[in-house]
Amino acid sequence: VVTARRLDDGREIWHKRLKPVIKDDKGIALKGAGIAYNGQRLFATTGFGGVFALEMKTGKEIWRYDTEMPIRIAPTTENNRLLVQTIDNTLIALDALSGKEIWKYKTTAEATTLVGGASPAYSSEEDVAVAAFNNGELRAFKASTGTPLWSEMLISPKRTNSLANITAIKANPIIDGDKVFAAGHSDVLMAIDLRTGKKIWEREISTSNQPWIAGKFMYVLSDNFELIALQKDTGKVVWNKKLPVPEHNAGLSAIGPVLANNSLIAALSDGHVFAISPYTGAILGFINVDDEIGLSPVIADGVVIFTTNDADLLAYK
């Protein structure tokens, strides 16, 4: 179900139940994968492989596309292009206006991987799309035709534990100017030239979270609960702050960061949320939302919105 709510008080505006093509399909359930917005339309992907374009104001269905394969990743959209990635490592480019398939690319998939995945990055200005696959591959495409441009494996030869041996990429890659920034689950954070695929710098940082870029800096929350500030152009570490976590933290995960009102917001999956100085890494304050959270917060008009594991929305000024 996709639901639109008012930002100021949370009141529902509309909701739309997205149904599979095969009505009695109860296998992979009706779990949603994610949504994207291009300024005109809302796009939603679902666990049963459906891609939907909806009217923003009413939720009315405009078109739908069936991938015939489960989706666990939010789509990416810019201008009139929509990029969708399925769990079998297939990247599909659709026309956002009509839902017509433009091109498709498929690579090998890993038998053992992580739940979810990374949404593709897309620059309409450069006509380049960058997708991260669960086999550890980062690949760039000419967005208009699907022609592969270059690829890089985000796998460290120094993997030290069983989790690091999982090659899946969960952190969304980021296109920033003429560079791509991408992080793998197996101790690799890279800056890559967007046009050539040449590696600019690399650091041994493992994260399942999309880094946050602000000006000349990049902020990364590692899987070891370390919030790290780096110089974007060189990869040099400016500061490193370990979040306060309990000694026994099995099952706990790090979430974020996002930058809001000159503070970095980072969280733990048990509901502890921290405001941190982007200049020094000092903790400015914290709250406990008293619920488990699994998704990075969203910032809108000075409001920080958390989604709990029970599908509740929590909004904070």
List PLM regions with ranges.
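Extracytoplasmic beta-rich repeat domains
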Residues: E12-A36, W63-E78, E101-E126, S151-I175, ...
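Loop/turn-rich, solvent-exposed surfaces of beta-rich toroidal or solenoidal domains
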Residues: F217-K232, K236, N240-A275
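Short loop/turn segments that connect beta-strands within beta-propeller blades
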Residues: L7-D9, E55-T58, D95-G99, A143-G146, ...
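C-terminal closing repeat unit and adjoining cap/tail of repeat-based domains
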Residues: S263-A311, K317
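Structural signature of WD-repeat beta-propellers
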Residues: T46-G47, T86-I87, F133-N134, G184-H185, ...
